[in-house]
């Protein structure tokens, strides 16, 4: 959704359609890709906004390890560590060496 010059919301656009998935938390990387934690089917996907293609980053088809990832975030001094919170087993998973850096967060002065 584009933000207009006056601050109002522009036209709504569906970015990705994920039938039979329950997407939850998201994070952007510096390449403009969207990282998506899917509570079901226990997976993390990476969606490229330019090519409109989504690729599987991590999956747990048995539901024994990721166990319902709900959020993803980039961490570390270089923002090159991916963290994924899991609702079903109350842990945060750490993925080192994902090959990208997370988008720097915007901290506006209010």
Segments predicted by a language model, with ranges:
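Structural motif
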Residues: 1, 43-46, 90-95
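Short loop/turn segments that connect beta-strands within beta-propeller blades
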Residues: 2-7, 48-52, 96-98
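A short beta-strand motif characteristic of beta-propeller blades
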Residues: 10-17, 53-62
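Beta-rich, blade/repeat-based domains predominating
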Residues: 15-34, 63-81
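Surface-exposed loop/turn positions within WD40 beta-propeller blades
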Residues: 31, 40-41, 51, 79, ...
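Residue position within the beta-strands of beta-propeller blades
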Residues: 36-37, 84
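Flexible "stalk/tail and boundary" regions
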Residues: 45-56, 71-76
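Blade-level signature of beta-propeller repeat domains, shared across WD40, Kelch, NHL, RCC1
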Residues: 69-110
């Amino acid at each position: 959704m584009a933000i207009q010059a006056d601050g109002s919301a522009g036209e709504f656009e569906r970015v990705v359609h994920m039938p039979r998935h329950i997407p939850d938390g998201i994070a952007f990387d510096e390449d403009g890709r969207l990282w998506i934690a899917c509570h079901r089917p226990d997976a993390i996907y990476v969606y490229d906004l330019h090519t409109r293609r989504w690729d599987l980053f991590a999956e747990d088809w048995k539901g024994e390890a990721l166990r319902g990832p709900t959020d993803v975030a980039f961490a570390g001094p270089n923002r090159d560590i991916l963290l994924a919170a899991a609702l079903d087993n109350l842990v945060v998973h750490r993925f080192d060496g994902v090959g990208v850096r997370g988008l720097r967060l915007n901290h506006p002065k209010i």
